[in-house]
């Protein structure tokens, strides 16, 4: 079965530090949850078909396995269940467009259609915004100082837009149609600290010049259809550009597939969250900050098929990091840091 972008998520690890469970939605509207036990795949639950494809999956209470809620969109309907598959929400939004982007935080539901953004508080309309071009992705972050997180839209007209409720806080133009946006955060630097990612100002003269975060700014990641990945530093008044990964500057002109999946995790265990990038040409990349504030490529694989979702976690072994990838055709592929494996595990 085919999968849409961001329709695969890893559930948080429980207190017993058992392997993480995985949920994935397909083009029939089913959501499947499974885990691994003694090396065997074990189905936890499977929902009935939803009549339309699962457009997006979002988790609420994402830091707590016991309380996590699994939310997904099918057409204009949002449904939710608990980690055992018991459905507790079926909400027809009555929107004019199918929901392609979804984010859930506490009682807030943020939903992006083709051109229309809607926000619901306890399933009641609370905000509305019509974008100037297609909404490709949606994230949230507390930027404006308002009590509720602000919505961040990545749009086809090359703009990243930050909304406070129904109001546009500001927008900024990128160097390509924005296909992915993601919240990003590292631990704040200790007083007097130095090293990668610390300090606000200019990078070394040999590198492109860009702003650095000194802890005052909220950080976002964005990806574009023409292959760029970049950092944005945001506060209540404006958006500043941080580093940018450009396929041309990196000498990778032939490897500039559009960014479909963007995630981050400290897979190198150096205290900085590494960038995980999945592209529409099947390229999987990990970028690290080991050597300075500009990310460096440390891992790359070509899967020969468009990547729709990408997460890091512990699915088959709690002692070794894994990159879990979902492809357009519904394949799930795991890349493990376990020395003895050598090869990736794959599930259809």
Language-model regions, residue ranges each:
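Beta-propeller-forming repeat regions
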Residues: 1-348
């Amino acid at each position: 079965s085919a999968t849409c972008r961001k329709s695969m998520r890893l559930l948080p690890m429980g207190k017993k530090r058992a392997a993480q469970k995985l949920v994935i939605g397909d083009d029939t509207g089913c959501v499947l949850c499974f885990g691994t036990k003694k090396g065997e795949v074990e189905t936890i639950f499977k929902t009935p078909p939803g009549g339309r494809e699962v457009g997006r999956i979002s988790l609420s209470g994402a830091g707590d396995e016991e309380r996590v809620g699994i939310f997904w969109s099918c057409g204009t309907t949002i449904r939710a269940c608990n980690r055992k598959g018991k459905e507790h929400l079926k909400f027809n939004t009555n929107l004019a467009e199918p929901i392609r982007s979804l984010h859930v935080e506490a009682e807030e539901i943020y939903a992006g259609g083709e051109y229309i953004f809607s926000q619901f508080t306890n399933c009641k309309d609370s905000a509305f915004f019509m974008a100037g071009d297609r909404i490709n992705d949606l994230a949230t972050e507390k930027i404006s100082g308002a009590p509720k997180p602000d919505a961040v839209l990545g749009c086809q007209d090359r703009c990243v837009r930050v909304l406070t409720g129904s109001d546009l806080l500001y927008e900024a133009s990128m160097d390509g149609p924005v296909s992915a946006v993601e919240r990003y955060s590292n631990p704040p630097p200790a007083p007097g600290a130095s090293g990668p990612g610390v300090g606000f100002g200019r990078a070394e003269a040999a590198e492109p010049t860009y702003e650095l975060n000194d802890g005052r700014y909220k950080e976002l990641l964005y990806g574009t259809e023409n292959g760029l990945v970049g950092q944005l530093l945001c506060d209540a008044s404006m958006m500043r550009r941080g580093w940018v990964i450009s396929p041309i500057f990196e000498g990778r002109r032939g490897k500039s597939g559009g960014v479909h999946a963007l995630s981050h995790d400290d897979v190198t265990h150096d205290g900085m969250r590494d960038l995980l990038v999945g592209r529409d040409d099947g390229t999987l990349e990990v970028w690290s900050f080991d050597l300075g504030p500009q990310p460096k490529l440390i891992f790359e694989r070509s899967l020969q098929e468009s990547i729709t979702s990408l997460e890091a976690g512990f699915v088959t072994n709690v002692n070794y990091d894994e990159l879990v990838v979902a492809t357009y055709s519904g394949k799930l592929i795991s890349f493990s840091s376990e020395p003895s494996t050598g090869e990736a595990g794959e599930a259809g």
